C-alpha cells in the first residue's frame, strides 16, 4: 500500500498530510475478506459481498481530499460498507488533546453494518466513542443528529441531494457521487451552496428503503 500511496501523492491525488497519515495508518487489508487480502494494495474496487464493493484507493483519496476532514469535526458517512472509509475519517477527526470528533456511519445492509463494526473495532474507534455505526437508510441523512460539519456518500445518487444539503452546518462540505460524477457542495449560508462537478467515476447505486 505504501507504494500506491506514494504514487497517489506523485500524481497529485493526495496532498493533505493528515489524510496521507490516515491512509498509511488504517490498512485497507483489515477491511476486506480473507480471500482478497493479497489484493488489498491494488488500485481497484474489491467485492465485499451483497453486490457492494470497497472503493478503489484513488477514489477514496480523491473524495477525502475534497471533504477535508479535520480533528474535532462531526461527520456523517453514508454507505459504510466495509468500514474502511469510516475508519479513515475517524483517524482524521480524532482529537486526543481537546476531545470531540465523531463519525456517524450508516449502512443499509445489516450484514455489512456488522462487517463494518467488526473491522472498525480493530482500531478501537468504536470503543473510544469516535465511531457509531447505524444500520438503516442513510439516503436522506440523519436529520435528528444534524447539523454536520461534513457529509460523505459512498454510493451514487440520481439527483442533487437537497435533504442532505440542509443537514450541513454553514461552511460545511458534502461530497457525493451523482450518476458518473463526484460532486462537492459547500454551504455558504442558509440558502446558498457553492458546487463543483468532477466527472469520470463509477459507483454502486445508493440504496434507499
Q: What name fits each language-model region?
A:
Residues 1-76, 84-92, 112-124, 193-208:
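Class I SAM-dependent transferase core
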Residues 68-96, 100-194:
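Conserved nucleotide-cofactor-binding alpha/beta core module
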Amino acid at each position: 500500500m505504501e507504494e500506491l500511496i506514494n504514487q497517489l501523492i506523485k500524481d497529485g491525488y493526495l496532498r493533505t498530510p493528515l489524510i496521507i497519515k490516515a491512509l498509511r495508518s488504517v490498512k485497507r487489508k483489515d477491511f476486506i475478506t480473507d480471500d482478497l487480502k493479497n489484493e488489498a494494495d491494488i488500485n481497484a474496487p474489491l467485492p465485499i459481498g451483497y453486490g457492494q464493493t470497497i472503493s478503489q484507493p484513488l477514489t477514496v483519496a480523491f473524495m477525502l481530499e475534497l471533504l477535508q476532514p479535520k480533528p474535532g469535526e462531526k461527520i456523517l458517512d453514508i454507505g459504510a460498507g466495509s468500514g474502511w472509509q469510516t475508519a479513515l475519517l475517524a483517524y482524521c477527526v480524532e482529537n486526543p488533546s481537546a476531545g470531540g470528533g465523531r463519525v456517524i456511519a450508516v449502512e443499509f445492509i445489516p450484514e455489512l453494518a456488522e462487517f463494518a463494526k467488526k473491522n472498525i473495532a480493530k482500531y478501537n474507534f468504536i470503543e473510544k466513542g469516535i465511531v457509531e455505526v447505524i444500520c438503516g437508510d442513510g439516503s436522506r441523512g440523519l436529520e435528528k443528529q444534524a447539523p454536520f460539519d461534513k457529509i460523505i456518500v459512498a454510493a451514487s445518487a440520481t439527483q442533487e441531494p437537497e435533504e442532505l444539503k440542509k443537514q450541513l452546518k454553514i461552511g460545511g462540505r458534502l461530497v457525493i457521487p451523482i450518476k458518473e460524477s463526484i460532486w462537492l457542495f459547500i454551504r455558504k449560508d442558509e440558502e446558498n451552496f457553492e458546487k463543483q462537478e468532477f466527472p469520470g467515476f463509477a459507483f454502486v447505486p445508493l440504496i434507499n428503503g
